[in-house]
Amino acid sequence: MISSELTNDQIIDLISDYKNFKRIIEASVPEDDRRRNQNRQNRNKDLTKLSNVQFWQLTTDVNDELMKRLTDSGADASLNDLDLKRGKAQSKLSRLKDAKFHKLILDIFTEIERRNLHHLDMGTHNNGLDEGDLNFYLNDTLFESFKINDDFMSVNGIISIEVFRELKTQFTLYFQNTLHRIDPVDTTTTRLPILLETIIKIAKLIGDLLPVLSSVSLQSSLENEIVYLKSALSHAITSTRYFLTYGDLIPRIVAQSSISEVIFAFCNIAQIVKIKSTSRDDISRNEGELSDIEAGMKPLKIIEKVKNEKNGKDISSLGDSGSTAVSFPSSGKPITKKSDMPVVVASPSISIIEKSESSIRESGKVRNNTSGETNLASVSPLKNTKNSSRITSEPSPREGLPLKVVSNSRSPSPQGNTLPLIGKFRQDYQASPPKKVITKPVAETAKPYANIPPAADVLYSPTVTKMRKFREKVQKFAPNSGLGLRISTSEENLNNSDVNSTTHNANINNLVEFVESKSMVVLPMAQGILNDVQASKSKLFKSARSVSRLCQNSIEIIPILESVIDMTTKAMVQKSFKLDLGEHCKEIIERLTDCSQKLSELCTYGCDSTKLGKKRFYQKLADILMEVTKRTRELVECVKMANRQTLSQDLSSFFNYRSVQ
């Protein structure tokens, strides 16, 4: 058996009992009897068989019985009878005669020395606390409410986490030592009592902390709490000194209440100036979640600022080209900072011309007409020279995207190697425009909402996979046929309606991809928050997220909803989209806009208990998120329905065209 089986309470009891036994034996038992007991070969074998815990229980009972016999007091007899096991042991010890009882004390005294338990002095005990060798006061319920929560922690805190933990350890050690009987202070000893050493350490830690608190711009409440802390500490030192001087004359509640006042004052100060975490444990605890720094930077204002910048760029785009360009964000991540926002190009006509040039080069590979060679000089005068310097100085928003750029050696233009790649998904829809279309202004042949990123930038979805397989089957009808628009092999002219149908079809498919990808992000996030709200009402409340964490997670949904609302609204204003999306889609967008505003207001004031009760907050948050989930799914179905109608119309047009031929 080793001493680590004993708790700290038991170790302190053994040390105290050993000192009591030694002092009493030296005062009352003759030296010959003590020497005879030490030289005795036949020791008490029953004591050697006991474990450390059992031996501690016996030592405690013997010490209590010894105190009763020395004071001739039986006042504690009724208390010991409450525990059956301890009551039986006390009753047996009380029936022992003085000779046998003294012999038992000598045996216990010898057994303590044989087990080397008397070497566990308080200095070794304190060193073990710092090294974590002893589990100090693990079952203490007094400090359960003293655990650090999110309200006490802050990155701009003044009190370091190390000082907080050291003070907590000293507070616990002080309470621990007040639970045992304290003898009057012996002036002949060279070492201070452990209780006095503890209160001196507490005073030193608080004294080192006061200059740090004084460096802060003092508020009236903080000044009052500092005065309260100094007064409580002075009272605790005085109470400890009197408690050690007069022993049992002063109840232990006096010392405990005095140190409690110090703890209360320290907690009030910690709530005002906050505790700063510097350990690795607190940093890795929130890894993978939303940073508290970002949450402290008022994310709603950041989102509003980004929206204003985006709207300003859209207005400048309208002033240059006279049309509105629909630009889908290429990332499925929530837009929480400026660098994540997609850049809106001020002159969309340049990108449209580059796409026209790319489609012309693609058509040159399949066109067999000798007179149908394209002259890019007819397109170059249409470039906006006003914004050409801006294009060379500002990086393209697609330069950072993981796209494969295919160099075209046939292109006589120096921009041929830097043109953005049109993905395979859009190449299926890119057609070879006839001569009449090339000579027309670009604004008439290309829709202003054609500036949509390639499908490689958008998350893949099951619907997109089905559409691609469908297009591959349709393309088998003819080697040079496309869905809704046939690539001409002769001098025939195609109507502009066919070109518009193709462009419209490509954009409606990209809209489906965009809405589906965003729904895959919004729905799991909303469901996770709803699960935490439900857990907060059940027995799993401790495992649920706090109100502040729910607010932060809900704020992440807002920019994603706004991007879906913004892109879908811009698509609905186009003439070709009005018939497909209909009034039902418009109603869904209005409901989602209302949900986004309510969620923003709730998450701004939801963490403040004075604004809204916790129960009411959970109810409102659940209602909003359920509405968001419902409307998001309806929007996905609405866009899918519009896409199916478009595919059906294109397919019927394709077969009608084939039958005419």
Curated annotation (Swiss-Prot):
GO terms under biological process: bipolar cellular bud site selection; invasive filamentous growth; pseudohyphal growth; regulation of cell shape
Query: Where do Basic and acidic residues bias regions lie?
Result: 356-365
Q: Where in the cell is it found?
A: Bud tip; Bud neck; Cytoplasm, Cytoskeleton
What keywords is this UniProt entry annotated with? Answer: Actin-binding, Cell shape, Conjugation, Cytoplasm, Cytoskeleton
Which portions of this protein are annotated as coiled-coil regions?
none
Ranges of biased composition (kind: Polar residues): 318-330, 366-395, 406-418
Name any one GO molecular function. MAP-kinase scaffold activity
Q: Which GO terms describe its cellular component?
A: actomyosin contractile ring; cell cortex of growing cell tip; cellular bud neck; cellular bud tip; incipient cellular bud site; mating projection; mating projection tip
Annotated region Disordered: the residues are: 313-340, 356-418
Q: SMART domains per the record?
A: GIT
Q: Does the keyword Cell wall biogenesis/degradation apply?
A: no
Is Acyltransferase tagged as a keyword? Answer: no
Q: Tell me, what does this protein do in biology?
A: Polarity-determining protein which forms a conjugate with the ubiquitin-like modifier HUB1. Involved in bud site selection and cellular morphogenesis during conjugation. Required for pseudohyphal growth.
- State whether it acts alone or in a complex, and with which partners, per the record: Conjugated with HUB1. HUB1 has not the classical C-terminal Gly residue, so it is still unknown how conjugation may occur.
More info: Present with 672 molecules/cell in log phase SD medium.
Name recorded for this polypeptide: Protein SPH1
Q: Which organism is it from?
A: Saccharomyces cerevisiae (strain ATCC 204508 / S288c)
Please name the gene that encodes this protein.
SPH1
